[in-house]
Amino acid sequence: MVKNQHYIPRFYLKNFAASDSMLSVIRIENGKPGSVFRCKPDGICSEKYLHEVKSRSEGAYFQEGAIEDMLSQVESRLAPKYEELLGCLDNGELIGTARLVELIDCLIAFIASLVVRHPKWLGPERKKASTLIPFLFEKETLTVSDLETLEVMGLKDDLPAIVEMAIMDAALFSTDERAPLMQIVDILKPMNVTFFAAPDNCEFIATSFPLHAEWMSTSDADPVAVYFPLSSQFAVAFRSCEPTGGKLVWPLIAEQVDSLNRCLVGGSDLNDLVFGTNGSYLASIISATAQHARKSID
């Protein structure tokens, strides 16, 4: 069983590393940024035994490593296609082809997965396990016969752990249309896709929740635009508007990249880490984001 379990896969993190394969990182605590530090992609966006559930009968954890193994299988399928997409953006191949559509579908699945596996989203869902048990009996999803079977197996005391594992399984892997994963996919899939390229000597940065969404009004359920940095060189926007025309990748100027980076950093309370290739640039973006927020309040 892996001790440090990532909520953002390493194959994504490494695309924001410098030429020496190291990330520059700033931690944000209580809204205040710390100092820049450097680390390998393995060293951030992870927690000890993040996807494990305490057991009363099977030792330390119930079915230890099960969720982490399933996530690793998902990542092993998505990672090559993610790298292929970045390669296509870099050299302009596959424009308008069925293969590109397939790669975008995989990208959407990956983005949806990042949302539901974030501990600040998944954690509260997992805590519902104990309170969910009476409801499951009421709906006869669980029965007295099930309890008797668990008792014979020596697992009766682990019913909360079993339900918590089921919650994670449904949230992270279910393709049922009612599942959180598929609800996010269904929002993104009809949207038009635009890719962006950063100019030389400029970079897209990422965060511990690398997603920025915008709504037309506070009463709307679904966003009208979603921004996601793909690497230090490329980013993507999903928008519920008319297509922008025949280009696959739109080159941006430095000011536009800065603006997108500020939107990402300031767009969510889930961002407790900001990372990229250049520590000084990260600090300047965080500072500019804070200044903009103060002006908005004033």
Regions found by a protein language model. Name each.
Residues 1-4, 8-298:
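Alpha-helical structural context detector biased toward long hydrophobic helices
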